[in-house]
Amino acid sequence: MENLPPNRGMWNQEYSHGRISQSFRSAKPLLDRKRPIENAPNSSNPLPQRMKESMDTESVSHNINFNSTPLMELSANTPYKRLKPEIESYADGHPCGLRTPPPRFDLDKEIINGFQTDIYADVGSLSEAFVTPLKEPERVTLSNGCSTSSILDDDFDDSILEEIDLICEQSARKAACQTPTTSIYQTPSKDNKSSDPKASLDFRDVEKFEPDSNVKLKLDEETPTIAADPALLNSMPDECSKYMLSLNDRQRDAACSNISTPLMVIAGPGSGKTSTMVGRVLVLLNEGLLPSNILAMTFTKAATSEMRERIGKSAGKKAAKDITISTFHSFSLQLCRMHADKLQRTSEFSVYGHGQQRRAIIEAVRLYEEEKKNGSKTSVPCESGEGLNGAGAGAVCPEYAKDLSKKWQKFVTQGKASGKSPEQCRKMGNEIGAKILGNYNDILKACDALDYHDLISCSVTLLSDFPEVFKECQDTWKAIIVDEFQDTSTMQYKLLRMLGSHNHITIVGDDDQSIFGFNGADSSGFDSFRRDFPNYKEVRLIKNYRSSRHIVEAASSIIKNNTKRCQSKSISSENSQGSKITVKECHNEEAQCAYVIDKIIEITNDGSTPCCSHGDIAILYRRQVSGKVFQNAFRQRKIPFNVHGVAFYRKKVVQVILAMLKTTFSECDDASYRRVFKALLPFEKEEKKRIIEHIEKISTSRKCSFISAASDIFNAKISGTFKRSQLTQGRKVLQTLDMVAKLVDREQSLSAVVTCVANMIPQKYLLEQRAVVDNDGGKLLNEDNDLRSVLQYLMDDVAEFISTHCTTTEEEDAIKEKKGCNQLHSFINYISERETENFRSRRRDNENSVTLTTIHQSKGLEWDIVFIVKANENEIPLLHESNGNASESGTSLEEERRLLYVAMTRARKKLFFLYVTVDSNWQVLQPSRFLKEIPGHLLQGDMSVNDCRKVHENLPNKTEQSVSSFGTDIKHEESKLTDNDVMNIPEDYASEESIAAYALNGNNFLKRFDVEVRSVVSHLFHNWAKKQAFQEPKRLIDKVRFVIGERLAIKKNKHKDVLRALKSSLTSEEAFQYAEHVLRWEQLPADTRAHIVREKQEHFQKLRIENSMGTSEATSKQIAFLHSLGCTVVPTSRLHASRLIEQYKSL
């Protein structure tokens, strides 16, 4: 890089003597052993030029694969008396500058033996060489300033140098074998002479090799003293220098590191990583880099906004605006659009989100099933839609294809994230996976689309296969900074490795906070970085400024149980100890919710302490479904709250608006037209489904688009399939789409277009949304039951897009007048990219409301008080849906532990753990296994750590152990479909249908049998579960199988059919889960079982009453009372009338 300053940390080879081996950097220290190290303090003559140059160099960054280590093994303090006296006599007798033949001299054998002894000595004994002072007063100095270095360099015996070269190389290899790990806090490993002629050893080296065991430096626990470079700070503007001084020593050391050295910053939770990255940017700007040459990459829009804002405060808004701060996908999208022709796409290609990707996978599975059945290759349709119900589906059942697609979606996501191709899958022996992945890629290519993983992989392809693109990126991005490095996938790391091939790269992350493995994140990227950038420097930020000491200690106690992490890390906190961690046992989810509400009211109304607002409180849960009970309860108790977990742009009403806008694009896919017809046709759900299926069938048979088939069908005067009213309503939908197209062509204002299209939603949509508006202050800020807030929310995004992405010139304004709303396409792409974002950068609406969110979505946020609810074994860790286990040594369980670590470190002052004993299905639950990993002196509450450990010990066996022994009889088709043994899928993105698959619901096994005979099955299990000999699920099932065999041998048995069916199903997964459920139930106290039974009876009695009221008409008294309350809604049933009365009475 021409515009970068010279690397002050590397050796200047121009002044190296030609006769000294370049691979051996110890020649200079060896010469220092043969001559006085420095001039006398009273010498007035300057040092020779060569010696000054060698001493002006700074330390180089740590290199794992160094070739020599003598600087740390050879003493620079050899007494002068061990050298031949000819040196002194020669130096005294010849003035500087006189060219006379130098005297010959040899090293004593004692010296050479001393070298060899020092080289092969133990590291502990080596440090003794540094006990002696660096300067010895009895040494002879060169009062005449003669160039000793030149004299010795010219006549040093080359054979001795070669011999010592060989010895030191052997020593380096031996040291590398004995100490494979690198220093936690990187220090120079080569000659580290200071630029000050009076200093011969860097201060940090002296401190590192201090022989006194009582003052050993513990780099994980103590922060090294790193003074700010005065020259660097003086060269910065005042605001920048003040910002650099505000950093702690480790942060400043990371920010001020040599910009030509790859830098790895391991930043623990709350350690100020954003401040460090901003400081790094300021240093890059101060070193002469242009803002446009700096690329900062992260994962969320909120993080990019925060970083840009902080840089703007110190470096100025103009510099902050010119720096490219982008998410991975936004950067890759821009790169792919610039070179779309090289990817066989148009520049207007579509970006498929989660829903469109799922439909494309469904279609890929359908094509594979057809090919397998027909034995021939089926042509790929030019659409990605839900084409399972059309004529092309043949005999493939839509439900079957959709079920398979759920499994294959994990495979495709993991494969795409790791850059796996169909050919690689085929080489691995996964022929089915190769075909489905190939079908999926063909569908995206035919639809001129890419998914989010394709954006990354295609960017890597552009950089690797097209040298001109690589050179363009190298010339543009001369320094790279990466945030949240632990969340990068394999392909994202490849992208970073190519962009940072010039070594000007800084990564910031924490392997203990890697929680997105389900989305392809690979925490081993740190090891890859160490391998690919061997001369890297590593700095660890270990001081937590966020949480109290009790919280930090508890979180550290949990995460240290992970084996696949750097065990030498130790996070500390200088905050107060704070309150102990509260662990509360609750009977069920309603009791848990009531406890949380009482605590919130107590905290916010406590007059004895500074009042805590609702905005300082958060409730974290593992699965989205766990937050619904809190939403309803908070509304009733008028507690303001907001839900981060609801994805705004996945709401149906918003998706309909976006689909109507997409129909104005020439590359609009059929899925958008389907959504519009489904929303605008004023028919019942089944009738609309039949109409859309018929249109799909016609479009497939004619091999035309969905809208073309719909136009032909509804523009016909008569139809043999549809009624006249259906044709009329279909024409109205087509007219509406035509109106939208004309509006976009005519109207220039993006806000006006979006508002008009939103108002085209049918009137019943507006009425339904307004009917359930909650006016008591406890509304959901992101809910789609308030259309006005949804529209305002959407318009706020339009305004933000215009202000940040639309800076037009006069020429562009002239083009805009001719083309109408040319910003619409960019806005839709902007929204599509944000579909996967979980948090808004704008939080002003949520400042005084309790936050309800999943643990995954809480990443990067913090609150004073945090409640982690439903901390049960089947929630945290969330057991795998296929076999209900989580291996202790597997990546799944370690990621679940990291997930809890992230949740705990969101809290500043107070942390609550809550777990339930019975779930909504009356299944007995156990507390999370992670709770027993917290030291008992940090806990307070109903359950101590010993109680938690006792609960786990009383269980029959750990789930993973039992399943592993029972797994020989249980075969899961899903394990054959995926390459990964365990895939951790967060419930944040799971559908409602898949929720039950994750929970250990024992009653699913009973549903295999008729209601009349379930008691036989239940009695058989419960009877033998009471026996002490059958307290393990596998032994209980074996006993039940044996008893069934005996009973079948009895001729007069009445339930032989039931017993045969039961015996054949005992090898299933659900049988094992039911056995666990029965064992847990029998271990409960008798009074607890009686209480649960009464609750069940009351619940089912209430359901029977509601079902009865729901099928009967409202009474005249109910209708009259509703009229007296001012209600104009006609109740559809007695139950509906009862609820309307309650609602209007509350008003």
UniProtKB/Swiss-Prot annotation:
InterPro entries associated with the record: DExx_box_DNA_helicase_dom_sf, DNA_helicase_UvrD-like_C, DNA_helicase_UvrD/REP, P-loop_NTPase, UvrD-like_ATP-bd
GO CC term (a single one): nucleus
Annotated EC: 5.6.2.4
Cellular location(s): Nucleus
Superkingdom, taxonomy of origin: Eukaryota
Keyword Zinc part of the UniProt annotation: no
Binding positions for ATP per the UniProt entry: A267, G268, P269, G270, S271, G272, K273, T274
Keywords for this protein: ATP-binding, DNA-binding, Helicase, Hydrolase, Isomerase, Nucleotide-binding, Nucleus
Domain UvrD-like helicase ATP-binding: start-end pairs: 246-548
GO terms for MF: 3'-5' DNA helicase activity; ATP binding; ATP hydrolysis activity; DNA binding; DNA helicase activity
Compositional bias per record (Polar residues), positions renumbered to this chain: 13-25, 179-189
Pfam families associated with the record: UvrD-helicase, UvrD_C
Region (Disordered): 1-56, 179-202
Catalytic activities: Couples ATP hydrolysis with the unwinding of duplex DNA by translocating in the 3'-5' direction; ATP + H2O = ADP + phosphate + H(+)
Cofactor(s) it depends on: Mg(2+); Mn(2+)
GO BP annotation list: DNA recombination
Biased composition (Basic and acidic residues): 190-202
Principal place of residence: nucleus
Domain UvrD-like helicase C-terminal intervals: 549-860
Family assignment from sequence similarity: Belongs to the helicase family. UvrD subfamily.
Function: ATP-dependent 3'- to 5'-DNA helicase that could disrupt recombinogenic DNA intermediates and facilitate single strand annealing. Unwinds nicked and partial Holliday junctions in vitro. Anneals two single strands into a dsDNA molecule in vitro.
Protein name stated in the entry: ATP-dependent DNA helicase SRS2-like protein At4g25120
Organism of provenance: Arabidopsis thaliana (Mouse-ear cress)
